[in-house]
């Protein structure tokens, strides 16, 4: 599956083409990164997944370096979102070292693990 990507740098909004979630894969629909008022960056991530209940749902997403070697933060999702698709959750004040200009967001589900598709977003002011 190919996901079309367009990056709008002015608002640091990453929009990904809406495609139906493949069974088991979490689709990252949108990522917004903004400078936090208390330092670091705030992230809003919208996910689409065919949650079926407590044994199969999108259970977290994380912010890492583009090469995947540095971990910056994680948003744990504590319950399924069967009737709320896509859904958006936030992670605030993520500290990212100076010099890092963009990060990768990847999503996970309880049954299949990490989704193949990731999203890369530019950090505002970097």
Predicted features, each with a name:
Residues 9-17:
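Bacterial N-terminal signal peptides
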Residues 18-23:
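Sec/Tat signal peptide C-region and signal peptidase I cleavage site
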Residues 24-61:
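Short, surface-exposed binding/anchoring microloops in extracellular/periplasmic proteins
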Residues 56-82:
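The feature marks short-to-medium sequence segments in extracytoplasmic or secretory-pathway proteins
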Residues 72-102, 108-113:
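Short, solvent-exposed, Trp/other aromatic-anchored flexible loops in extracytoplasmic proteins
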Residues 116-126:
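Short beta-strand elements
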């Amino acid at each position: 599956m190919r996901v079309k990507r367009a990056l709008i740098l002015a608002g640091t909004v990453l929009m990904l083409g809406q495609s139906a979630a493949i069974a088991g894969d979490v689709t990252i629909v949108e990522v917004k990164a903004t400078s936090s008022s208390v330092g670091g960056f705030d992230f809003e991530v919208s996910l689409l997944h065919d949650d079926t209940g407590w044994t199969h749902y999108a259970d977290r997403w994380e912010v890492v370096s583009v090469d995947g070697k540095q971990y910056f933060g994680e948003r744990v999702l504590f319950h399924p979102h069967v009737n709320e698709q896509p859904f958006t959750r936030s992670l605030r004040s993520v500290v990212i070292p100076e010099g890092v200009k963009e990060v990768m967001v990847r999503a996970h589900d309880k049954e299949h693990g990490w989704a193949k598709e990731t999203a890369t977003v530019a950090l505002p002011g970097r």
